[in-house]
Amino acid sequence: MENFLDNKNMLYALKMISPGTPLRLGLNNVLRAKTGGLIVIATNEDVMKIVDGGFAINAEYSPSYLYELAKMDGAIVLSGDVKKILFANAQLIPDYFIETSETGTRHRTAERVAKQTGAIVIGISQRRNVITVYRGNEKYVVEDISKIFTKANQAIQTLEKYKTVLDQAVTNLNALEFNDLVTIYDVALVMQKMEMVMRVTSIIEKYVIELGDEGTLVSMQLEELMGTTRIDQKLIFKDYNKENTEIKELMKKVKNLNSEELIELVNMAKLLGYSGFSESMDMPIKTRGYRILSKIHRLPTAIIENLVNYFENFQQILDASIEELDEVEGIGEIRATYIKNGLIKMKQLVLLDRHI
């Protein structure tokens, strides 16, 4: 399953036409006029090679100009930064041997031009009143804002449910880490719930881009719900990664799991470097302590790294005296006391079943 946000070409095109942008204002004007239109954004020289005839405009772009020029039958060619209208009423002559799945003349041309040049091509259907964006081999149909809002709100509700389940799993893991009772199952469960949250988040992030200026509220809700989940996911990998696989590589492997594979917790165990046999899921394992230590306010990453490297695991850090903590590079007596008190306070919060 390809993450929409990983497709940089379409992401760039989508941001360019998101609500609130000058280009989207012009496209909306054309939609309301029901004239249809074909707009090419000349991001490279290949575009100009297939432009024939028309009028050389070379004027500053404005939504009203786009609306007026779209009344003519030909294509409108804009500069790569959408600051200038280069040509109007132009004929586009792409290679007609390029395959296209479209039926209408305007959209067949748009798809061929996009495939041949890699440029962003926008087709506005006169009858269906729909905006379609093409870039390379990709195609995207722009949905109505109200529909996107409905989908975004539904996704936010789903995320709230997933996040509640994740928070319960993390709270449980916190208690187990402080009491040195963590098993592979506990870690795999948290990893699974985190990935489920991240997948819903990716969908909402796509909606936020589609909503443009209108998506501010959805974006704020998303950030509020997510909290430190993105950081915690990386730190859990650092805490329990048995084979010291690169974190980015590990995250990529988790992201590439399909829905059926994600349900099976043994797959998470395998990614961490454990056997993956269901009977070994109850095997006790120890955390390195990156995630818990990161919760101590204003404790630098370099100090956390020194602590983890000095002690074998988090339990040893937890049991260490102030004098033993003081021996770690970069930690003086004041900071050692601060770390010790911070860990004691967090352990008390965990016993009270509170989030840290």
From Swiss-Prot:
<dbReference type="InterPro" id="IPR010994">
    <property type="entry name" value="RuvA_2-like"/>
</dbReference>
<comment type="similarity">
    <text>Belongs to the DisA family.</text>
</comment>
<dbReference type="InterPro" id="IPR036888">
    <property type="entry name" value="DNA_integrity_DisA_N_sf"/>
</dbReference>
<keyword id="KW-0067">ATP-binding</keyword>
<keyword id="KW-0548">Nucleotidyltransferase</keyword>
<dbReference type="Pfam" id="PF10635">
    <property type="entry name" value="DisA-linker"/>
</dbReference>
<dbReference type="GO" id="GO:0006281">
    <property type="term" value="P:DNA repair"/>
</dbReference>
<dbReference type="InterPro" id="IPR003390">
    <property type="entry name" value="DNA_integrity_scan_DisA_N"/>
</dbReference>
<feature type="binding site">
    <location>
        <position position="92"/>
    </location>
    <ligand>
        <name>ATP</name>
    </ligand>
</feature>
<dbReference type="GO" id="GO:0005524">
    <property type="term" value="F:ATP binding"/>
</dbReference>
<dbReference type="GO" id="GO:0004016">
    <property type="term" value="F:adenylate cyclase activity"/>
</dbReference>
<protein>
    <recommendedName>
        <fullName>DNA integrity scanning protein DisA</fullName>
        <ecNumber>2.7.7.85</ecNumber>
    </recommendedName>
</protein>
<keyword id="KW-0460">Magnesium</keyword>
<keyword id="KW-0227">DNA damage</keyword>
<comment type="function">
    <text>Participates in a DNA-damage check-point that is active prior to asymmetric division when DNA is damaged. DisA forms globular foci that rapidly scan along the chromosomes during sporulation, searching for lesions. When a lesion is present, DisA pauses at the lesion site. This triggers a cellular response that culminates in a temporary block in sporulation initiation.</text>
</comment>
<keyword id="KW-0547">Nucleotide-binding</keyword>
<comment type="subunit">
    <text>Homooctamer.</text>
</comment>
<feature type="binding site">
    <location>
        <begin position="105"/>
        <end position="109"/>
    </location>
    <ligand>
        <name>ATP</name>
    </ligand>
</feature>
<keyword id="KW-0808">Transferase</keyword>
<dbReference type="InterPro" id="IPR038331">
    <property type="entry name" value="DisA_sf"/>
</dbReference>
<dbReference type="InterPro" id="IPR050338">
    <property type="entry name" value="DisA"/>
</dbReference>
<dbReference type="GO" id="GO:0106408">
    <property type="term" value="F:diadenylate cyclase activity"/>
</dbReference>
<dbReference type="GO" id="GO:0003677">
    <property type="term" value="F:DNA binding"/>
</dbReference>
<feature type="domain" description="DAC">
    <location>
        <begin position="7"/>
        <end position="147"/>
    </location>
</feature>
<dbReference type="InterPro" id="IPR023763">
    <property type="entry name" value="DNA_integrity_scanning_protein"/>
</dbReference>
<dbReference type="Pfam" id="PF02457">
    <property type="entry name" value="DAC"/>
</dbReference>
<keyword id="KW-0238">DNA-binding</keyword>
<keyword id="KW-0234">DNA repair</keyword>
<comment type="function">
    <text>Also has diadenylate cyclase activity, catalyzing the condensation of 2 ATP molecules into cyclic di-AMP (c-di-AMP). c-di-AMP acts as a signaling molecule that couples DNA integrity with progression of sporulation. The rise in c-di-AMP level generated by DisA while scanning the chromosome, operates as a positive signal that advances sporulation; upon encountering a lesion, the DisA focus arrests at the damaged site and halts c-di-AMP synthesis.</text>
</comment>
<dbReference type="InterPro" id="IPR018906">
    <property type="entry name" value="DNA_integrity_scan_DisA_link"/>
</dbReference>
<feature type="binding site">
    <location>
        <position position="74"/>
    </location>
    <ligand>
        <name>ATP</name>
    </ligand>
</feature>
